[in-house]
Regions:
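Serine-dependent protease modules
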Residues: 22-265, 271-274, 315, 319, ...
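Nucleotide-binding motor/catalytic cores of P-loop/tubulin-like NTPases across gene-expression machines
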Residues: 273-276, 305
Length: 354
């Protein structure tokens, strides 16, 4: 009896051991990745940019000129992506995670921040949505996940960390995008416009660029979510971002110093637009043109050196201090006129659409 009993217990233990080890176990980190992918992937889409070419007989020949990623943010079919993904598109085709395809309509675009909004008319139950988190709360070293369609390989998940904050990169139109998130999560061509997620599965950035044309080398960039949250209302309502301006044509004095002119660092006002903020505040543009060597230089205008105590010496400095504000806000402009330092309070107005 005892041998039989011992044999029975032995077989039970072997069976339990086999069952336990036959079940795949995942680490806490792996479980988190799996959960985020399961919850988020239905909100991520592929966007094909279809251009139209014409043959010898002027017959239209559609051709895919590029593709990228986007993600849905509500059940009205609103998709966030990069501007360069949809730029110059004759037709947009959006592919959902269930492989269904829908025509996309460009709702709004902001080339300065490389962001755009596309809308589809698909059944709400056919896709998921993602929520934004505030990028002001993120820190270097925290875990991030990138979802996208690199090289056309749809629904690809990569992981990494935030490598740095506050980077500056150039948009395709040459304007500087500031406050950029740097990550080592693998980002490749086709990932553009996809979400950069935190460990709760919320969007903290929009993947936009990599270093090197051949693909990821461990350095990718994302536009922070707070930038998107700031401009999305304008894109949805107006189709573009309404930005304030001073209404001046400035010349960075660094260029004048290079040709031998002894001048304070700042922005020389070449011209003031009638009725604009600078004009209303009494700022003055150039009163004459002087010749320096073979160059003709506007001269006699005020030289702006600071805005709200922040030095400004380039077009990017000026844009950062003015265009990130709202119409009606007031700023203090410090400037030099006839070798004397002055200050004036300027109330900002919107830049005309034209």
């Amino acid at each position: 009896m005892f041998p039989s009993r011992h044999l029975f217990l032995f077989l039970v233990l072997v069976f339990c051991f086999t069952q336990v080890h036959g079940v795949t176990s995942y680490s806490v980190d792996e479980q988190e990745n799996i959960s985020i992918y399961a919850k988020s992937s239905r909100a991520v889409v592929n966007i094909s940019n279809i251009a139209v070419n014409y043959d010898f007989y002027y017959r239209a020949i559609p051709a895919e000129s590029g593709s990228g990623t986007g993600f849905l943010i509500n059940k009205s079919g609103i998709i966030v992506t990069n501007y360069h993904v949809v730029e110059n598109a004759s037709k947009l085709v959006v592919t959902l995670s269930d492989n269904s395809q829908w025509p996309g309509k460009l709702v709004g675009a902001d080339p300065n921040n490389d962001l755009a909004i596309v809308r589809i008319r698909a059944p709400a139950e056919s896709y998921g949505v993602l929520k934004f988190s505030h990028s002001n709360d993120i820190v270097v070293g925290q875990k991030v996940l990138a979802l996208g369609n690199p090289f056309g390989l749809r629904q690809t998940l990569t992981t990494g960390i935030i490598s740095a904050l506050g980077r500056t990169i150039a948009a395709k139109n040459g304007r500087k995008i500031e406050g950029i998130i740097q990550t080592d999560a693998a980002i490749n061509p086709g990932n553009s416009g996809g979400p950069l997620l935190d460990s709760d599965g919320n969007v903290i950035g929009i993947n936009t660029a990599i270093i090197g044309s051949a693909g990821s080398v461990g350095i990718g960039f994302a536009v922070p979510s707070n930038t998107a949250l700031r401009i999305l209302p304008d894109l949805l309502k107006y189709g573009y971002v309404r930005r304030p301006w001073l209404g001046i044509e400035p010349i960075p004095t660094v260029y004048l110093r290079r040709i031998g002119i002894d001048i304070q660092e700042g922005l020389l006002i070449a011209r003031v637009v009638n009725g604009a903020s600078a004009d209303n505040a009494g700022l003055r543009g150039a009163s004459e043109t002087v010749k320096v060597g073979r160059y003709k230089v506007p001269w006699g205008g005020d030289i702006i050196t600071h805005i709200n105590e922040t030095p400004v010496a380039s077009m990017e400095d000026l844009a950062q201090q003015i265009e990130t504000r709202k119409s009606g806000e007031k700023v203090t402009v410090r400037f030099i006129r006839l070798k004397k330092v002055h200050s004036v309070v300027v109330e900002l107005v919107l830049r005309p659409r034209s």
